Amino acid sequence: MPSFDIVSEVDLQEVRNAVENATRELASRWDFRNVEASVELNEKNETIKLTTISDFQVKQLVDILREKLVKRGIEAGALEIPEECEHSGKLYSVEAKLQKGIDSVMAKKLVKLIKDSKLKVQTQIQGEQLRVTGKSRDDLQGAMALVRGADLGQPFQFNNFRD
């Protein structure tokens, strides 16, 4: 029986490259001259800390980072960015979290979405991924198109396609 897995993964090496590119752009941008601003990746916690002297510039930093991530092939939805900036002393900062894995709530939403579509496939939650099994390849491709088309706020990848 053909099957595939739905996962949500982020390549940390590409994130590191995007952060370095954003830092490089910070050094050359006119509006960030003589401004204390930084973009730091914490690989252990899988977070990116954006720090600068005003909340407006934090939003600019977020836009720069998103642009660099998209150029490196990482969807902007892979970053979970809080609306409010933290203010400490003279600096504003935002700690963006990388979304990796499919949590149980999102997995249940995906299962419900696929079951409500009346496709002839079965879904199983396996930890932080979802296994979709069907009798025909066409049904599986329909499920892939359905998941791609759904706006669930998190990017998904498909791997381990078996025939």
Curated annotation (Swiss-Prot):
Family from the record: Belongs to the YajQ family.
GO cellular component terms given for this protein: cytosol
GO MF annotation: an example: nucleotide binding
InterPro entries, per the entry: DUF520, UPF0234-like_C, UPF0234_N, YajQ-like_sf
Keyword Ribosomal protein: no
Species this protein is from: Edwardsiella ictaluri (strain 93-146)
UniProt superkingdom: Bacteria
Record SUPFAM superfamilies: YajQ-like (SSF89963)
Protein role: Nucleotide-binding protein.
Protein name (database record): Nucleotide-binding protein NT01EI_1072
Record keywords, A-Z: Nucleotide-binding
HAMAP family: YajQ (MF_00632)
Disulphide connectivity of cysteines: none
Keyword Nucleotide-binding: yes
